[in-house]
Amino acid sequence: MTFAANFSLVLPEVILGVSALVLLVWGAFQRKTSPLFTGAAVLALLGAAVAAVVGPHGHAFNGVYAADAAATYAKVAIYLSSAVAIVLGDRWLAVRGDQKFEYAVLVILAAVGMGVTASAGDLISLYIGVELQSLALYVLAAFRRDDAKSSEAGLKYFVLGALSSGLLLYGASLIYGFAGSTRFADIAAVGAAAAHGTHGVGLLFGLVFLICGLAFKVSAAPFHMWTPDVYEGAPTSVVGFFAAAPKLAAMMMFARVLGDAFPDSVAQWRQVLIIASLASVFVGAFAGLAQTNLKRLWAYSSIANVGYALLGVATGGETGLHSMLLFMTLYMVDVTGFFACLQALSRDGKPMETIEDMAGLVKERPGIAVAMTAFSLSALGMPPFSGFWAKFYVFGAAMGSGDVLLQWAAVLGLVGSVVAAFYYLRLIKAMWFDAPAGAVDKPQPTARAVGFAAALFSFPVVMVALIWLDPAARAAAAAFGHA
């Protein structure tokens, strides 16, 4: 393949990489962000999304990079989520009077890394993408350098992230040692030929370490320890970003590695994913019961929801991966909207971040209270909100798989949803029935608008959106397994 053909396939990453460098130089002279600077960053992400949609499909650089329907689907969602994060972050910085230009640059660099992982066709490109996004996210977690909790969050994330990278690299080195290649297609060929020999066992041993490293990135139990502390300490706009785009990118990593590199080892890795899925669901459900801080509560909610997405990956095949992609897309909208609403709220200039702070919110800010209620019911899986359809697809895929383990996992997942209902309903009860805790400041218009838009998507827009989201996710799921 010629250089021009390779270049056309990686154009979205090129656009974002060049834009990040230009914005970095621009910011160095300007010293702070501005509406024009923020607009340029958002435009770069939208341009990359368009390039991903209209660009050609194929494999670049001898199979190291895959531009297919799955990558396109994930990149569009990731880039749009990143653009929203930049807009919300710009408003957060403006309120604090500390308009650092690095915020937008870091989000773009994280988006580049996520895009690379979504298109990875090789263990090396996978690792490069993972580390590029992780390094940017470490800095974003500690972006409030004058805040002890933010600095602590960034440090914890960095230290545990280094551990997970070590696990991932160790697994990758074992796989390379037994397969003799880092390309997913070559690993799949070796795995198929040596499924019952020493090489097959060695590959599976490496895969276990690789899954452990990836589980950290997606906050799956038992590698979830960093999530509540990082969510609590990081800025609200950053938390909304953390809970959305990186989660989809991490799920794409799971789908790429398992679907493209280990398609003949489904029986082995399915058991591991089912255990991780159920552990995540029940850790998220039960640990969330004791939380009063909303960021920590939604951290455990995200752990539980990762469990449901992993159930879709464990189901495998086009149906399972289709359910995972739809689940993550709908979940991204809900979690972005919830944290946008949370960012919009303050009392006496201080953020409202606990359930007690939300007491009587419907009397002070009825619109935001209704939106947050919608997001809570959606995360719970209550019909007709988008979260119901997300879980409907995942549980439907598991129950229709014909695998008894997956069917029991789906039943237990429903039990976990019932347990988690308590903390969602506790928040709703505080907003609607408790006495107001005091006057609420005028909300941030941009954050409020994002929250309202996401709430409208959750219902009723989702009913129309699924008409084109469903076939798009199905086409994306069909692309896996063709490394």
Curated annotation (Swiss-Prot):
What GO molecular function terms would the record report?
NADH dehydrogenase (ubiquinone) activity; NADH:ubiquinone reductase (non-electrogenic) activity; quinone binding
Q: From what organism does this protein derive? A: Caulobacter sp. (strain K31)
Tell me which PANTHER family the record gives: NADH DEHYDROGENASE (PTHR22773)
The Gene Ontology biological process annotation of the record reads: ATP synthesis coupled electron transport
Q: Which UniProt keywords apply?
A: Cell inner membrane, Cell membrane, Membrane, NAD, Quinone, Translocase, Transmembrane, Transmembrane helix, Transport, Ubiquinone
The name on file for this protein is NADH-quinone oxidoreductase subunit N
Q: Which reaction does it catalyse?
A: a quinone + NADH + 5 H(+)(in) = a quinol + NAD(+) + 4 H(+)(out)
Q: Which family does it belong to?
A: Belongs to the complex I subunit 2 family.
Q: Which Pfam families match?
A: Proton_antipo_M
* Membrane topology, as annotated: Multi-pass membrane protein
